[in-house]
UniProtKB/Swiss-Prot annotation:
<keyword id="KW-0808">Transferase</keyword>
<comment type="function">
    <text>Mannosylates Man(2)GlcNAc(2)-dolichol diphosphate and Man(1)GlcNAc(2)-dolichol diphosphate to form Man(3)GlcNAc(2)-dolichol diphosphate.</text>
</comment>
<protein>
    <recommendedName>
        <fullName>Alpha-1,3/1,6-mannosyltransferase ALG2</fullName>
        <ecNumber>2.4.1.132</ecNumber>
        <ecNumber>2.4.1.257</ecNumber>
    </recommendedName>
</protein>
<dbReference type="GO" id="GO:0000033">
    <property type="term" value="F:alpha-1,3-mannosyltransferase activity"/>
</dbReference>
<keyword id="KW-0472">Membrane</keyword>
<dbReference type="GO" id="GO:0005789">
    <property type="term" value="C:endoplasmic reticulum membrane"/>
</dbReference>
<keyword id="KW-0256">Endoplasmic reticulum</keyword>
<feature type="transmembrane region" description="Helical">
    <location>
        <begin position="79"/>
        <end position="99"/>
    </location>
</feature>
<dbReference type="Pfam" id="PF13439">
    <property type="entry name" value="Glyco_transf_4"/>
</dbReference>
<dbReference type="InterPro" id="IPR001296">
    <property type="entry name" value="Glyco_trans_1"/>
</dbReference>
<comment type="similarity">
    <text>Belongs to the glycosyltransferase group 1 family.</text>
</comment>
<dbReference type="InterPro" id="IPR027054">
    <property type="entry name" value="ALG2"/>
</dbReference>
<comment type="pathway">
    <text>Protein modification; protein glycosylation.</text>
</comment>
<dbReference type="InterPro" id="IPR028098">
    <property type="entry name" value="Glyco_trans_4-like_N"/>
</dbReference>
<dbReference type="GO" id="GO:0102704">
    <property type="term" value="F:GDP-Man:Man2GlcNAc2-PP-dolichol alpha-1,6-mannosyltransferase activity"/>
</dbReference>
<keyword id="KW-1133">Transmembrane helix</keyword>
<dbReference type="GO" id="GO:0005811">
    <property type="term" value="C:lipid droplet"/>
</dbReference>
Amino acid sequence: MVKDEKELNIAILHPDLGIGGAERLIVDLALGLKSVGNNRITMYTSRHDPKRCFKETSNGELDVHVTGGYFPRHIFNRFMVICAIIRNLLAALYIIFFSGQKYDVIVLDQISASIPLFKLFTNSKVLFYCHFPDKLLTSRTSLIKRLYRIPIDLFEEFTTGCADQVLVNSNFTSSIYKQSFKHLKNSPSVLYPIINTNEFDKTKQSHNFSNQPIENNLINPIKLDDKKFFLSINRYERKKDLKLALDAFSVFISNSESGGSGKGKDEIYLVFAGGYDTGLKENVEHLQELKDKAKEYGLENRVIFLITINEEQKQWLLLNCCCLIYTPSFEHFGITPLEGMYAGKPVIAVNNGGPLETVVDGKTGYLCNPTVKDFANAFNKIINDPINSKKMGINGKQRVNDKFSFKPFAQNLNTIVKKL
């Protein structure tokens, strides 16, 4: 067991320190370990672009070393998993034999391949963060692919089981982990991801969205700063079920215009904002599908599509929407509901996966069956009871501060490391 008073020398190995949810978590994990005592943190990665990374990894706040990146990421666009494993092993060999350091703790995530090396050649305790079993993230559309994955899946289970402690991002992921790795007896511990509340606090509500340089991204140019709107933030992918929000919004508006009990729905908009890459066929196709559906419903003047917004724009939207809508089912965790809650907004989300652990039904928002009827009813509750909606927003921000902010994250992480 690691002693409380000891200053720890800790290495963190991550495949690609770019910009993404896994990268944000591993950076927060490094900052959390650094904030506890005087721990020395060194990050290793096979790829790090200073122009495309979180600033903490490029401004000197965290010590980052690139190693193993000389091996290709793929071979003629194939064997990506094998190449990732080899890059991981090469980075591990550098840490073990050439870094000149002896580490008390090694932290890895995403790729477990090198864990046996650290256990065999060092006295380090190994902590592995499993965002989600890799074996469940790959398609097996052909017999060759299925056969190819058999040894890789077995290797993943074996190497994951070599860690001294495994962490996952939610109880939902923990249950999937146990189903996927049936031969592993030790249960993982849950360490929830967090949001960067300090950065969020820097954005003021006084920012005028109409002055932001995104007017070309609007399906219909409109000033949002004086409008009431529901907000959905997700990538333009079909698995995110954005159509559910659009269908529910259509029913919500239709009920109002046919004499429903809703108030002022003629002034309400639905805003979709999310990642969009013209090089990704699905992004292009799905955005057009949603635009066509909005036109079919006669809502082209009430549904707004924004693409590839920056952090400041996203925070403005969160601070000024009336409610955040979260439609993906069986998400491993889902950070967006936390962002909505910290912005002081109620959240309408599906009643499965990660949101079951972040959103408290009736207190910080509404958890709904992923049906048009249930989501439309929740839309109606938000608009018809503004006092309760405001109260839920206040409750949500308090819940994030209590459970999903940096301080409890660092404290929980420190407790886990002490027990290694």
